Amino acid sequence: MTIHIKNNVNWVGQRDWEVSDFHGTEFKMTKGTSYNSYLIQEEKTILIDTVDHRFSHQFIQNLEMEIDLTSIDYIVINHAEEDHAGALAALMEKIPGTPIYCTENAIDSIVGHHHHPEWNFKPIKTGDALDIGNGKQLVFVEAPMLHWPDSMMTYLTGDAILFSNDAFGQHYCDERLFNDEVDQTELMDQCLRYYANILTPFSALVTAKIKEVLSFNLPVDMIATSHGCVWRDNPTQIIHQYLEWADNYQEDRITLFYDSMSNNTRMMADAIAQGIHDVDPGVAVKVFNVSRQDKNDILTSVFRSKGILVGSSTMNNVMMPKIAGMLEEITGLRFRAKKAGAFGSYGWNGGAVDRIHSRLTDAGFETAVGLKAKWRPDGKAMQLCREHGQFIAKQWALKPVTTTFQTINVEKKTIPASIAEPVIMVDPSVSSTVESEISVIASNDDKQCMLCTVCNWVYDPEIGEPNQGVEPNTAWIDVPDYFLCPECNLGKDVFVEVK
């Protein structure tokens, strides 16, 4: 099956309605995908990319119905990943000497996957051109790390088609191939989901590469992607959208996601979300349970947000495993210009919140004060959680908030950037009319040593902790509330007096 693209260019790819996972389990596909391969028939015949290896036989069978395979003069591989070049081995069995145009990095990857160093590779550089007859050329543009080191784009002069590889694509399967034929909301949702989960770490490179391509002053009448729809109606709309997404994108949105052992942390999330809405009804608040909802939906919401709040029950003194996994994904995606905070419930130790706070800080977020609740929050504790949401709403507002609510009065402290900020402790026995205070174990003895109940590290007042700005001869009661155990990275609440 072929679909006519323009003049002597046809789509010869493969639709995949059933696929659900991409990059292992990194990306969940909700709308299937397509593997777009293109056949150009000028004086020379060129095949741009193949399809996923699972469809090799079907791809070659369909191609043989259209042309004599031996008439293919050149193969162009924009990307060596298996969903682009997966059928290459089967194709080369049919036409073994055919030149393959790709980047040097692609040669390394293709040989690594298929183990055929004898193939007729033709390495390219940005600006190289290949004459294909009828006054037309293929112009190559390297695009490393969009999203692999081997990536490149190919431009067809005369027809003004940019074969853009993964850029501007989407995992979206439809019998209709062109962007103006499909549901526009679905299309843009899938474009955003694709960018947020796959291209976000390379946003600076996206901007630089788009500006480089635009500097060539080449007309672009059509963008033929490697996945999903071909952009023929106003194709530059997706280019401008990418530039916006790459520029520290955020909406007036706050995303909360959590995992909970006994629904206690879920209760906190609900109350915090309500508090945010109390103060700023205009902000979009989205709440997700990581154990029950799709992680890529959550990450897309994080991408769209000005700030996130991450909650977890404490289990074995650490956060729940799925929260840890989400934070690892978030760290890899390298979000920028976003705020974050931690919250969670605990029984005898609230280490999860401290660890979440540290991970968010390390991931580049501007971190806010965290919130811990002991055991199941009662009505008073829920009110304090709601007030915490009100506090967050005011602190993170993109414009002045006129709604007046009494919020938690968190004392401002001068805190070194490398040290985690304080955590508010919510105890069900505390009256909601009393301001929350940071819970510490105080000792009136200036020389009293303190023992970390988690790792057994001992704080000695005579020595202090210079790495955290705690001078020698500092009594425990005077140690700053942002202090963390240097061994296990937990807060002051896990310390007890050495008897």
From Swiss-Prot:
Primary localization? cytoplasm
Q: Binding residues for Fe cation 1, per the UniProt record?
A: H79, E81, H147, D166
The record's annotation in SMART domains points to: Lactamase_B (SM00849)
Task: Give the gene that encodes this protein.
Answer: norV
Q: What is the lineage of its organism?
A: Bacteria, Pseudomonadati, Pseudomonadota, Gammaproteobacteria, Vibrionales
Give the organism the record lists.
Answer: Aliivibrio salmonicida (strain LFI1238)
Its annotated compartments are:
Cytoplasm
Where does the record place the region Zinc metallo-hydrolase? Answer: 30-210
Ligand binding (Fe cation 2) = D83, D166, H227
Give all residue intervals belonging to the Rubredoxin-like domain: 447-498
Instruction: Give the cofactor note text.
Output: Binds 3 Fe cations per monomer. Binds 1 FMN per monomer.
UniProt-listed HAMAP family? NorV
Q: Which family does it belong to?
A: In the N-terminal section; belongs to the zinc metallo-hydrolase group 3 family.
Tell me where in this chain the Flavodoxin-like domain is found.
254-393
Q: Does the keyword Zinc apply?
A: no
- Pathway, according to UniProt? Nitrogen metabolism; nitric oxide reduction
Question: What does the UniProt function comment say about this protein?
Answer: Anaerobic nitric oxide reductase; uses NADH to detoxify nitric oxide (NO), protecting several 4Fe-4S NO-sensitive enzymes. Has at least 2 reductase partners, only one of which (NorW, flavorubredoxin reductase) has been identified. NO probably binds to the di-iron center; electrons enter from the NorW at rubredoxin and are transferred sequentially to the FMN center and the di-iron center. Also able to function as an aerobic oxygen reductase.
The molecule here is called Anaerobic nitric oxide reductase flavorubredoxin
